[in-house]
């Protein structure tokens, strides 16, 4: 995983070209998850699941670069508790009843376009190098496919 920062303009991520040794692996958070955790008791948002509203790193929820909430506890039969993050003055980091805006995925992709092209080219080159090293030992080249998001990306790269 490469380093990233949060883009307040798009609500998305901006990739950098510095490899990161330990990755936090942010994941997108959609309205369905927000509803389950009770975000609708603090903020308003449209009930759409086409674009994420924010990102989560472990149990922390980040909206446009600010950690606004975290979850604690929870289990198979109990709902986790949502804790709204407050600043040093005791005020919520994101004002109560503020409307959440979805991540602008198109603009985020445009801003990361050159970095994504470099990553794609490097990955295709590595795949090709492995193929060339093994092509005399094999009569066909298989790529594992689980159907997950990583497999879908890999399938696109090896076409």
Q: Where do the language-model regions lie?
A:
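RNA-binding accessory domains that recognize and position tRNA/RNA substrates
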Residues: 1-144, 152-159
